[in-house]
């Protein structure tokens, strides 16, 4: 099991990144909440990781904080929740926000996530109710080496990356494109575009 990786951020293509660890490039899929906090390409970063072994692939998932990884592991234990849906949930809601949803049994927040209908949201909240106290108590012990602003990206490239990331989360291409195009602010990074688009679609 690969539990943690520390290396140079070689590539950042939402929702994937490549981490160069002593000359070996590890492709890692991350939730948007982790993507927002990544340093510049070329800088050092540490990620808490979870490895999923399948017959046809070994898949690595990375997280900014250790408690995010623990939440991911709990989510994929739930009936009908695989890594894709777990990442979508964690991309739409911060850990503390998800805990509050469970406390309040708030289905509306979950149904805004692609692939989560009302019945699924109700079931997830019931199953999560007994676990949120443990998550709430998990310490946030992980800190990135650098948390500076994102590097400037070409506008067309940033918008394209943002649309691709939203599609990977389950949004329809037309929805993703419309949400990104609706953002009036200029010269935003792909991470900022994704964040604003998700809020707009919420």
From Swiss-Prot:
InterPro entries: DNA_helicase_Holl-junc_RuvA_I, Hlx-hairpin-Hlx_DNA-bd_motif, NA-bd_OB-fold, RuvA, RuvA_2-like, RuvA_C, RuvA_C_sf
Organism per entry: Pseudomonas syringae pv. syringae (strain B728a)
Entry GO CC: cytoplasm; Holliday junction helicase complex; Holliday junction resolvase complex
Subunit (UniProt): Homotetramer. Forms an RuvA(8)-RuvB(12)-Holliday junction (HJ) complex. HJ DNA is sandwiched between 2 RuvA tetramers; dsDNA enters through RuvA and exits via RuvB. An RuvB hexamer assembles on each DNA strand where it exits the tetramer. Each RuvB hexamer is contacted by two RuvA subunits (via domain III) on 2 adjacent RuvB subunits; this complex drives branch migration. In the full resolvosome a probable DNA-RuvA(4)-RuvB(12)-RuvC(2) complex forms which resolves the HJ.
GN (gene name): ruvA
Name by which UniProt lists this protein: Holliday junction branch migration complex subunit RuvA
Gene3D superfamilies: 5' to 3' exonuclease, C-terminal subdomain, DNA helicase RuvA subunit, C-terminal domain, Nucleic acid-binding proteins
Keywords tagged on the record: Cytoplasm, DNA damage, DNA recombination, DNA repair, DNA-binding
Ranges for region Domain I: 1-64
Region entry Domain II, spans: 65-143
């Amino acid at each position: 099991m690969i539990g943690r990786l520390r290396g140079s951020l070689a590539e950042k293509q939402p929702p994937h990144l490549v981490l160069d660890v002593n000359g070996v490039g590890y492709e890692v899929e991350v939730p948007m909440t982790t993507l927002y906090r990544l340093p510049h390409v070329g800088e050092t970063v540490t990620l808490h990781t979870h490895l999923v072994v399948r017959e046809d692939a070994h898949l690595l998932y990375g997280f900014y904080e250790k408690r995010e990884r623990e939440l991911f592991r709990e989510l994929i234990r739930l009936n009908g929740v695989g890594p894709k849906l777990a990442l979508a949930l964690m991309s739409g809601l911060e850990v503390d926000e998800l805990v509050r949803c469970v406390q309040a049994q708030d289905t509306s927040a979950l149904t805004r996530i692609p692939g989560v209908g009302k019945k699924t949201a109700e079931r997830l909240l019931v199953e999560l109710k007994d676990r949120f106290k443990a998550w709430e108590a998990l310490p946030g012990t992980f800190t990135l080496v650098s948390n500076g602003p994102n590097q400037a990206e070409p506008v067309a490239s940033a918008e394209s990356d943002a649309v691709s990331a939203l599609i990977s989360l389950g949004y329809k291409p037309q929805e993703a494109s419309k949400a990104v195009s609706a953002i009036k602010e200029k010269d935003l990074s792909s991470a900022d575009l994704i964040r604003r688009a998700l809020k707009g679609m919420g």
